[in-house]
Amino acid sequence: MAKATTIKEALAKWEERTGQKAGEAKEVKLYAQIPPLEKMDASLSTLVNCEKLSLSTNCIEKIANLNGLKYLKILSLGRNNIKNLNGLEAVGETLEELWISYNLIEKLKGIHVMKKLKVLYMSNNLVKDWAEFSKLGELPLLGDIVFVGNPLEEKHTAEGNWMEEAVKRLPKLKKLDGNPVIKQEEEEGDES
């Protein structure tokens, strides 16, 4: 089997293809590397100006080495093999959007550090209980969540109460699974 691509190799290919220097770029796309990336290694720390980083569609198992990315606002890690959210604390003060659908995440431990997070796309993971989902309530700015395809969502959608139960736990939500959240008071207020 082919050896995994390193971040350093992927960055060199990206620089060659785009004609940009990785250390100066605001947006860096390292998705779908062949062979795939398996580790977020220390070479990521060279991306000192990066605001949007895409590492989706690889074989990454752990979030790591984000400490040099002082301006990171959007992190795309969808379609990997990530099992938990450890490693995000390094970008807790700047990250506004986390795209982490199609991974193996069961627990949301560590999400509380993401104080600026507004958008969380984490469909098709393994979250199965409300205790985990409720941890999202610790994020003051979170307004848009995609959670479809998690066992918790599937169970409650089948029971017909997903939106209602989710919004009860996260009253600040504006959008859930792509649908605008309409609060009870707003509906009643429209009738007057």
Swiss-Prot record:
GO CC terms of this entry: cell projection; cytoplasm; dynein complex; microtubule
LRR repeats mapped onto the chain: 49-70, 71-92, 94-115, 116-137
Gene3D superfamilies: Ribonuclease Inhibitor
InterPro entries reported in the protein's UniProt record: Leu-rich_rpt, Leu-rich_rpt_4, LRR_dom_sf
Superkingdom as given in the UniProt entry: Eukaryota
GO MF assignments: alpha-tubulin binding; dynein heavy chain binding
Annotated SUPFAM superfamilies: L domain-like
GO biological process: outer dynein arm assembly
Keywords: Cell projection, Cytoplasm, Cytoskeleton, Dynein, Leucine-rich repeat, Microtubule, Motor protein, Repeat
Disulfide bonds, paired cysteine numbers: none
Miscellaneous note of the record: Outer (ODAs) and inner (IDAs) dynein arms contain the molecular motors that generate the force to move cilia by ATP-dependent reactions. There are two mechanosensory systems that monitor and respond to the mechanical state (curvature) of the axoneme. One system involves the central pair microtubule complex and radial spokes and the second system involves the outer dynein arms.
Cross-referenced PANTHER family: DYNEIN AXONEMAL LIGHT CHAIN 1 (PTHR15454:SF73), NISCHARIN RELATED (PTHR15454)
Protein's name according to its UniProt entry: Dynein axonemal light chain 1
Organism whose genome encodes this protein: Xenopus laevis
Protein encoded by which gene: dnal1
